[in-house]
Amino acid sequence: MYLPKHFQVDDLQILAQLISEYPLATLVGNLDGHLEVNHLPLMLSKDGKKFHGHIARTNPLVKVAEQENREVTAVFHGPNAYITPAWYPSKQETGKVVPTWNYAVVHAEGKLSLIDDPHWIRQHVSQMTDTHEPTYQSNWKLADAPEEYVQMMLKAIIGIEIEVGSLVGKFKLSQNRSPSEYTGVVENLQKSPEENLRAMLALMKKPQ
């Protein structure tokens, strides 16, 4: 990933927060000379050293985990927004401005392995459910479904673990603009009712 220093974020707490809010990862591995790309939610351990998730047993990622080259990259996509040059004060002064795109992503690289343990898989799925259900003010739990059905569904999946080798963020949030232009972006984002632009605004207001 192209990563200018002023966009680089290494703080684990900041990276973990984005991953927690946007857990759906684009997971890329190499299988027989071609890229194997999947999309799945992952959970980061508190120490930032491991990711856990689950996939269908028929997913080609199983073969990726079983081969010698088990290196994968997980990409987490946070807020993103088109930034119009009309928001820059310098547009009126010189006209020397162009559009750009602000965004925040986290890249994790590491080795993929499988966890084929029924007890672990059940515990993992329960943990993931308990983590995300409160967002919808719901108290649904795995135990609410018929046990026979749960067992059938759990048998169809396998756990995965990624041992993190590197974890870095790229938060392109207009840091390379002048203070007045940065302020212009923030002020105009504040006027927008669009959810994605509000998410970008919240991120720009956080200390990086």
Predicted segments, located by residue:
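Binding-site signature for planar aromatic cofactors or substrates
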Residues: M1-Q208
